[in-house]
Amino acid sequence: MKVIEGVLRLKGNEKIAVINGRFNHIITDRLVEGARDAFKRHGGNEDNLDLILVPGAFEIPFALEKALSSGKYDAVCCVGAVIRGATPHFDYISAEATKGIATVGLKYGKPVSNGVLTTDTIEQAIERAGSKVGNKGAEAMVTIIEMLDLYNEMGK
């Protein structure tokens, strides 16, 4: 059986965007740094990494649609943080952001990762933004790198 699998490698010419929902920026700034660091550690040329800022997680799918429709990017890494509050707002925002990211990624057939945190507390978000549980922004970028290699391996 032939196994087709992406590996963690960049050639250095891949153009990747990170879309950051700025709401909860104390958390999302760390996610962006994690993504940037992972991109550089795996051979990415920082001149080929763009940061697109949007107000919050709900706006990420719109920016993702614009980024992918431009034809400028090989892949897009989405990061943000939605923290549960006392109202159902969390449920609506997290569901729509997740659905929107998946829908747009499939529409354009390009690698897209969802590094949007959905946590019950700010402490959980901090832990996932580089404290105790690693950095989910870095993990989202590593996912993009592997999927981009798989995408290329499968012949686009």
Swiss-Prot record:
Gene name as annotated: ribH
Gene Ontology annotations for the cellular component aspect, listed alphabetically: cytosol; riboflavin synthase complex
Pathway(s) the chain acts in: Cofactor biosynthesis; riboflavin biosynthesis; riboflavin from 2-hydroxy-3-oxobutyl phosphate and 5-amino-6-(D-ribitylamino)uracil: step 1/2
Lineage of the species this protein comes from: Bacteria, Pseudomonadati, Campylobacterota, Epsilonproteobacteria, Campylobacterales
Keywords assigned by UniProt, alphabetized: Riboflavin biosynthesis, Transferase
Pfam families (alphabetical): DMRL_synthase
Binding site for (2S)-2-hydroxy-3-oxobutyl phosphate: A86, T87, R128
Keyword Nucleotidyltransferase in record: no
InterPro entries to which the protein is assigned, alphabetical: LS, LS/RS, LS/RS_sf
Highest taxon listed in the record's lineage: Bacteria
EC number: 2.5.1.78
Descriptive protein name: 6,7-dimethyl-8-ribityllumazine synthase
NCBIfam families named in the record: lumazine-synth
The UniProt record lists the keyword Lipid metabolism: no
